[in-house]
Amino acid sequence: MKSVATPQSELPHILIYGSVNSGKSTLFNLLVGQEYAVTSPIAGTTTDVLYKRIELPEVGPVVLGDTPGVGDTSPLGAQRMAATRVALRRADIILVLEESLDPQLVKDYPNAIFLPFKLPFSEEREALREQTIELIAKTLKGRKSYRQETLLGNLAKPGDLVLLVMPQDKAAPKGRLILPQVQTMRELLDKHCMVVAIQPEELGATLSKLRAMPDLVITDSSVFQKVEKQLPHEVPLTSFSVLMSAYKGDIHRLVAGAKVLSQLPPNAHILIAEACSHVPTNEDIGRVKLPKLLRKKLGDELVITHVNGDDFPTDLSGYQLVIHCGACMMNRNHLLTRQEEATRQQVPMTNYGIAIAQLLGILDRVVLP
């Protein structure tokens, strides 16, 4: 039976950064143990960000990235550097192949750890490989934010009965569950909880058949209101999106961002950001359900812009609020960096589940991990 690989969004990201012809691709190939990236003496050989999953001793799988070089003067140089900047957003460790470390780089990516390399490489290749891998492993093991984060925090303990409400509508992927549901179920099983998974239509019947009320209910944010109305007030309620907001980002800032919803003008400009790219359906939460709820509460003059994947604008000054998805397909540093960019530009940011709970007036009812 083929094992399922750990999602790339759960792995540490190590990025190689530096000027053109500084040896980035050479170091990349050295670390992956094969000629994976094209190398040449011609400046600007690397034209796109290149990723490769590798296994490090004592650390496990990580994602290593090679990037287009700084100082690319070709006609596409600016676009290549834009791709590099996007990649830097998700980096946990940045191997810098420069004579000196640019202070602005550190300021722009405060959540990353920078490891400068002296140029040119003087060590024997195998020795350099071993030293670099040892340095990366040591850095990751000592990194506070690299600790084993949990989705649930203290919301569930061994023996708890946890009810998962998971609508399988047109927006649900065919033949499988979405990643937050899978990760939540796995963590609950690891905690030795008893897990019951249902669709919203079966909630009432399920509650009536249980001998006791569940210790926790986790729902899809799109049916928050429907579930909340049927639950006794003493039963703790949260959503997969809320869990992801704490797992991937700074939940306290995301909750504070949602409070702004009650203060927005009717013609406010809101950015809705989705981490992954998928074809939306008429039941899509980001493209249909959330905008509909926003306009119901704030009015039809509301201006909503949607972005997907890496198309997150560097200039957020034209928006009064950013509403981000749960970021299940992004690593933690990527979402934290987006939060930092929004904070720097004084633009509040929240996420789908928290925003929906706020708009429905039940945010105080929702438990946070």
Regions found by a protein language model. Give the residues of each.
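Hydrophobic "anchor" residues on beta-strands that sit immediately upstream
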Residues: V62-G65, L95, L216, Q320
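Flexible nucleotide-interacting loop at or near the entrance of a catalytic core
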Residues: M1-T6, L128-L152, P173
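Conserved GTPase G-domain signal focused on the G5
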Residues: G23-K24, P120-K144, A246-K248, G361-I362
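Conserved C-terminal guanine-recognition region of P-loop GTPase G domains, centered on the G4
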Residues: K52-G60, P68, P75-E130, I136, ...
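Conserved G1/Walker A P-loop phosphate-binding module
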Residues: M1-A78, A82, V86-R89
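Charged, alpha-helix-enriched surfaces in structured cytosolic catalytic cores
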Residues: S22, T26, P41, T45, ...
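Short, flexible loop segments at the rims of nucleotide/cofactor-binding pockets, characterized by
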Residues: P41, V70-L76, S100, L140-G142, ...
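P-loop NTP-binding site
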Residues: A156-P369
